[in-house]
Amino acid sequence: MSFPVPGPSSRESKSIRSGATLSQHPGKRSSRSTPHLRHEPDLATKLAFLKRPESYPGRVDRVESLETHMSWLFLAGSDVYKLKKPYRHERIDYATPAARRLNCLREVRLNRRLAPDDYLGTVRLTIDAEGRMALDGKGRTIDRLVHMRRLPEAFSLEQRLRAGTVTPMQIGRVVARLLPLFRDGPRARWSVRAYLRHLRTRITGTAAGLCRPGYGQARDQIEALAKALLDFLDAHADLLAARARERRIVEGHGDLRPEHVYLTAPPTIVDCIEFDRELRLRDPVDELAFLAMECDRLGHREVDAWLFAAYRARTADHPPRALIEFHKALNAFVRAKIALWHLDDPDTGPRRRWLARAGDYLARARGYIDGLRNRGHPHRNPASRRDSG
């Protein structure tokens, strides 16, 4: 069993050095510590150390480095080491060593729920009195990395979908893997009113983010999408309130995309959101709708039916189609905003790439909303504007 190696296409990744391609760093074995440093190492010095094969235990012939929006990954033999960027944006705070340490520990603990054998722990990046860096060496800790096994990318749901080899039985196993988390995970302590307020804030906050200056989005179109989602929320407050009243909102994964699901035996699911518990608090229907929406984006709309058939067959929960479509629309709306966040970072690739990605998500959100309208669902009911509970 190995840990995920996200490629540039699936994880918005690129080489740290080239900014475009996977970077491979062959090198001879030597000391596992750096040459003497007479000052506190800066980020570039840390990265240079982590790109060296001799920095890692065991025999590592080369290190492949990948940069994502919030971290660097160092692929060393059968292992992966993740260094979080000193990054702060809205709910995410990795700005200080203490914050990165806390989030590394959380990442390991939370992801062991669905990938218990693949999150090996955390590793300290240390520097000794002579200025030499090492992994778990003597001296002072200057940063922390997540240590993981490397999963074969060919096993990812994303790659299997692209190859056209995914079956309903495999999707059923993914649902079965998630069910203990949905059934036994900590419940949100939200009243009905708080849950409805959470959904409303998610919609309005996303709309505000999409309309930020510099993102180039048409405000009237964003506001129309937000209004349609709010109309559904108002018209179906009783349906959504019942989900909270039945205590279905659980601390789940929060980022259930095809590239985070591996069709191993049993399935392995990685990379949950660790930095904000509220973003992990989801209705299971919301989680599965997110995965279904991302599979739709890859051209595999059949996965939606497989996911919810497996879910209904294994639970006493039978969510109506309108609820599923609402969550697909809302998740696409949120993902459009996240795509546009990349425009704030010049190192994440061409601007047109992220504008196109956001446009695709917004088109999907409109499509799901149009589907709801065709079913006659999101008509505003003034009486339902009063949050229940």
What residue spans do the PLM features occupy?
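ATP/Mg2+ or Mg2+-diphosphate-binding catalytic cores
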Residues: 337-381
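N-terminal non-globular leader segments, chiefly Sec-dependent signal peptides
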Residues: 32-41
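Low-acidity, Ser/Thr- and Arg-rich intrinsically disordered low-complexity segments
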Residues: 2, 8-18, 23
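Phosphate-binding active sites in nucleotide-utilizing proteins
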Residues: 382-383, 388-389
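Conserved ATP-binding subdomain of kinase catalytic cores across diverse folds
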Residues: 30, 46-245, 253, 258-334
